[in-house]
């Protein structure tokens, strides 16, 4: 079996201390990394932000800026029609428990803080690169199109500049909101107050005009965190309370997708070529199920993702038909999009590519059924319209209801691991006949 194409590049020119390594395309990684403005010099302003605003900025000052015509459209929220990106700026997309994600031109860049106190060696936290690349290299058919492979991964880089950018932006917003609301400026910010006022003003032209004026001065970076800034507040404030680690970590570069799977909704499914939102969820379920079936045809130990949900399935354009063969069954997808599995942070292939993070997430051996149990629960939650389709509801309930299994918070405690033949039988049923080409489904 083939192992991932890994091109290691020990880079000490990026850091004064600590070894760094680049996996994958070093040229594209360096392009991204070198476009982060002043990463080694980003620091809190010499003059404290609250003091500058207290001494020099009044409500009348802000009012004059608001009445001015100048506005930088890159500070609107990304979903706003008025948003317009500047070349080679980084725009915050989202932040979760295990990564801060930005968009930069045709790339998605994910920063992951790795806590050295957890005793992980740098190469033990590379599953987001190694596992999808391993699977892609060993799968031989169109099922490879259902996997997102990282372009490159930088390991053990110093990324604490993100925390400084956060604090600068938080201090800026705190000062602006206090003046706008007629409240006294304070040396210490209240993140709860900033969250409340950010929700109030983020769509406002006046707010964007003020950010256009002050963000370049206070933050002085091409990393724009204004979009979904509330996610960053939740991440850094929660992590600060738990003594979070914000020094070194990994930088992972992915191709830019159209969107994540949950962004296709009852309001827009027709734009993607579907007759209903339920048909789309069947399409998503079938493509991911076929990927798992083809993975389990490989002569390797159990693959488990451990976080299978629409958030971690990305949508890409599909410019030609996709053909998948399982036994005597032929599946054909002619839709203009395809679903691709992403975010392999907790994934593992037992004994071949183990993952210490997976060990902390589950306490016993699991397989594909664990993922689809959780996936089915989430589909019901995200798409309640499924309940109107009795056949699809019944099918998904086969993963969520069983007297022999104990379901706790969508997580499955399994006494016996079901065979992949169970899933093969599921995808051969008439409910998926739209995508089955010329084969009998009478063995339902």
Swiss-Prot record:
Pfam families, per database record: Pox_ser-thr_kin
Alphabetical keyword list: ATP-binding, Host endoplasmic reticulum, Kinase, Late protein, Nucleotide-binding, Phosphoprotein, Serine/threonine-protein kinase, Transferase
Post-translational modification: Phosphorylated in vivo. Autophosphorylated in vitro.
Family (UniProt): Belongs to the protein kinase superfamily. Ser/Thr protein kinase family. Poxviruses subfamily.
Reaction(s) this enzyme catalyzes, per UniProt: L-seryl-[protein] + ATP = O-phospho-L-seryl-[protein] + ADP + H(+); L-threonyl-[protein] + ATP = O-phospho-L-threonyl-[protein] + ADP + H(+)
Cited function: Essential serine-protein kinase involved in the early stage of virion morphogenesis.
Residue numbers annotated as active site: 307
SUPFAM superfamilies given in the database record: Protein kinase-like (PK-like) (SSF56112)
Residues annotated as binding ATP: 93-101, 118
GO cellular component terms given for this protein: host cell endoplasmic reticulum; host cell endoplasmic reticulum-Golgi intermediate compartment
Keyword Lipid biosynthesis set for record: no
Coiled coil: none
InterPro entries: Kinase-like_dom_sf (IPR011009), Poxvirus_ser/thr_kinase (IPR008790), Prot_kinase_dom (IPR000719), Ser/Thr_kinase_AS (IPR008271)
Localisation: Host endoplasmic reticulum; Host endoplasmic reticulum-Golgi intermediate compartment
Protein name, as recorded: Serine/threonine-protein kinase 2
EC number: 2.7.11.1
Transmembrane portions of the chain: none
Top-level taxon of the source organism: Viruses
Principal EC category: transferase
Domain Protein kinase: 87-444
Keyword check for Membrane: no
Molecular function GO labels: ATP binding; protein serine kinase activity; protein serine/threonine kinase activity
């Amino acid at each position: 079996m083939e192992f991932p194409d890994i091109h290691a590049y020990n880079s000490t020119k990026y850091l004064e201390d600590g070894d760094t390594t680049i996996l994958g395309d070093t040229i594209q990684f360096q392009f991204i990394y070198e476009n982060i403005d002043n990463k080694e010099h980003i620091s809190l302003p010499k003059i404290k932000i609250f003091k500058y605003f207290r001494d020099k900025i009044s409500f009348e000052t802000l009012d004059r800026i608001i009445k001015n015509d100048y506005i930088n459209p890159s500070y609107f929220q990304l979903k706003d029609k008025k948003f317009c990106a500047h070349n080679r700026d980084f725009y915050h997309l989202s932040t979760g428990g295990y990564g801060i994600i930005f968009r930069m031109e045709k790339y998605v860049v994910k920063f992951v803080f790795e806590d050295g106190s957890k005793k992980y060696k740098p190469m033990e936290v590379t599953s987001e690169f190694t596992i999808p690349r391993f699977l892609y290299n060993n799968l031989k058919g169109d099922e490879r199109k259902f996997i997102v492979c990282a372009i490159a991964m930088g390991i053990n880089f110093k990324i604490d500049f993100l925390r400084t950018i956060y604090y600068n932006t938080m201090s800026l917003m705190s000062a602006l909101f206090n003046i706008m609301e007629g409240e006294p400026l304070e040396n210490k910010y209240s993140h709860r107050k900033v969250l409340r006022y950010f929700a109030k003003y983020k769509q406002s032209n006046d707010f964007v005009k003020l950010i256009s004026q002050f963000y370049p001065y206070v933050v002085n970076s091409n990393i724009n965190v204004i979009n979904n800034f509330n996610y960053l507040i939740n991440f850094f404030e929660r992590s600060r309370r738990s003594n979070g680690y914000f020094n070194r970590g990994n930088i992972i570069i992915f191709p830019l997708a159209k969107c994540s799977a949950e962004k296709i909704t009852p309001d827009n499914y027709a734009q993607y070529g579907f007759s209903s939102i339920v048909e789309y969820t069947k399409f998503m379920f079938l493509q991911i199920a076929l990927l798992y079936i083809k993975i389990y045809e490989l002569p390797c130990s159990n693959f488990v993702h451990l976080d299978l949900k629409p958030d971690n399935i990305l949508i890409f354009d599909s410019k030609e038909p996709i053909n998948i063969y399982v036994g005597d069954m032929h599946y054909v997808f002619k839709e203009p999009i395809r679903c691709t599995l992403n975010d392999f942070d907790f994934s593992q292939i037992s004994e071949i590519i183990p993952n210490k993070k997976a060990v902390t997430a589950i306490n016993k051996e699991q397989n594909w059924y664990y993922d689809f149990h959780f996936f089915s629960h989430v589909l019901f939650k995200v798409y309640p319209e499924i309940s109107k389709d009795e056949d699809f509801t019944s099918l998904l309930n086969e993963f969520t209801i069983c007297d022999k299994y104990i379901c706790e918070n969508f997580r499955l405690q399994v006494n016996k691991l079901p065979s992949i033949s169970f899933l093969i039988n599921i995808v051969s049923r008439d409910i998926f006949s739209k995508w089955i080409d010329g084969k009998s489904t009478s063995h339902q």
